[in-house]
Amino acid sequence: MKQYDYKTISRTMLGDLHTPVSTYLKVRDIFPQSALMESSDYHGSENNRSFIALCPLASVSIDHGTAIFRLPDDSREEHPITDAYRVENALNDFRARFRVEGEYSNYCGLYGYTSFNAVRYFENIPVKDSREATNDAPDMLYILYKYLIVFNDFKNEMLLLELSLIHISEPTRPY
């Protein structure tokens, strides 16, 4: 299993002239698979942040009983979801391949979604497994992004964050 090591490069800017939505509308066509996530907790404004994620580096998707890893070196791995290898095992195995260090590294996680149909992987509830020709979105999709724009409305700050690859390590094998 390869280990991907990244460091963060960051720049903080004044964010009072930009909103998350207006910024996202400007960049979404330039960066396919971009994402906008806004905080809906208006009670604790000190932790109220919005995120724009751009340029996927790697992803893990769960669909039709299979976990699919897409890695930064363009490799792809498939792992069947079973009673012995559950969704949480797949997510942990994927996440363990990445190490991020540097300032604001806590923002550099997996961003994505879990659909309602993913309940089949956690509860004994039958869900019809159908395939759509036009929109066959995975039950779960989580992406590690190269660029993040973090809006802190409480401080009127906008943080630009980049993940820079510093090392790919191969596993050591005993001889």
Segments and roles (model prediction):
Residues 104-132:
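Extended, Lys/Arg-enriched charged tracts that mediate electrostatic binding to polyanionic substrates
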Residues 69-77, 161-165:
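Secondary-structure transition/turn motif
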Residues 59-60, 131-154:
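Structural signature of FAD isoalloxazine-binding scaffolds in flavoprotein oxidoreductases
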Residues 39-41, 115-120, 144-147, 151-153, ...:
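Short, structured patches in soluble enzyme cores that scaffold and shape functional sites
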Residues 55-56, 61-66, 71-74, 150-156:
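Short acidic-glycine loop/turn motifs at beta-strand connectors
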Residues 84-101, 124-136:
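Short acidic (Asp/Glu) patches
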Residues 1-61:
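An N-terminal JmjN-like helical accessory module and its immediate linker preceding a catalytic domain
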Residues 166-175:
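Single conserved hydrophobic/aromatic residue that forms the stacking wall/gate
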